[in-house]
């Protein structure tokens, strides 16, 4: 489970991160990452798992796998970093290891671009 202080809950946080952040696409997910300098409360993560991924059981399984994958990465993030992870339909059939690998690759690609734009 992702601790509450790391969770994105407001729609404004999601929309700001998606619109102003950098995007890094992988086959089964898309990562949007932004750096919010005026809020040093810690890195925050939001998940978007649409109905196109599958029924409620499948969507919840994908969400759990993504939360589990992002949890160890929180220590590597700066306090102002905001992440929105959008699962694509292929995430339903992807293994946990594959989702973790894709998330790591997306984060590796996005982080230098976010830090350069800050």
Swiss-Prot record:
Gene3D superfamilies: 3.30.230.10. It comes from the Bacteria. The keyword Metal-binding does not apply. InterPro entries: Ribosomal_Su5_D2-typ_SF, Ribsml_uS5_D2-typ_fold_subgr, RNase_P. Keywords: Endonuclease, Hydrolase, Nuclease, RNA-binding, tRNA processing. GO terms for molecular function: 3'-tRNA processing endoribonuclease activity; ribonuclease P activity; tRNA binding. GO terms for biological process: tRNA 5'-leader removal. It is an enzyme of class 3 (hydrolase). The keyword DNA repair does not apply. Consists of a catalytic RNA component (M1 or rnpB) and a protein subunit. This is Ribonuclease P protein component. It comes from Mycobacterium sp. (strain KMS). The gene is rnpA.
